[in-house]
Amino acid sequence: IGRADLVLIPLQAKQLDGKQAVRAIQLVKRQEKAFRRRIPHSVLLTRTSAAIRSRALRAIVEDLEAAGVKILPVELIERGAFDAFLAYGGTLEALDRKEVAGVDKAIENARAYAAAVIQLLRENEAEAQAAAVAGGQGA
């Protein structure tokens, strides 16, 4: 964690996941102190519903936002294609669309997730470079 460019903390809308996410964030904060550097981190909402947002998830998101925790803007939606991909291996693109429902939506979701992570990494790099320049000007 101490040398990571980005720490993603997966979170389902479950009480136990919420508690574990808090523990993970606390670990990141301890590592920040130990390494004397900011460690970019964000919560990734997983296995969410494409149709509705549960009360539990809304409450968890509100609590995280109130605590200033960054949440990745893309959620990994609960889809059978993700389960099949993990069970059978290979790639999402290789799944048989006749046997597995929602493959195209899962691919779209996975691409949006990847793009969000790349964007966050770029933003973090730009912030780090700006901080380095600002720190160098005071010397």
Question: Language-model features: where?
Answer:
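Beta-strand-loop-alpha "switch" segments that mediate conformational coupling across diverse proteins
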Residues: 49-52, 60-93
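Structural beta-sheet core signal
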Residues: 9, 43-45
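Charged phosphate-binding loop/patch that engages nucleotide di/tri-phosphates or the phosphate backbone
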Residues: 109-139
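Inter-motif core of Ras-like GTPase G domains
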Residues: 1-15
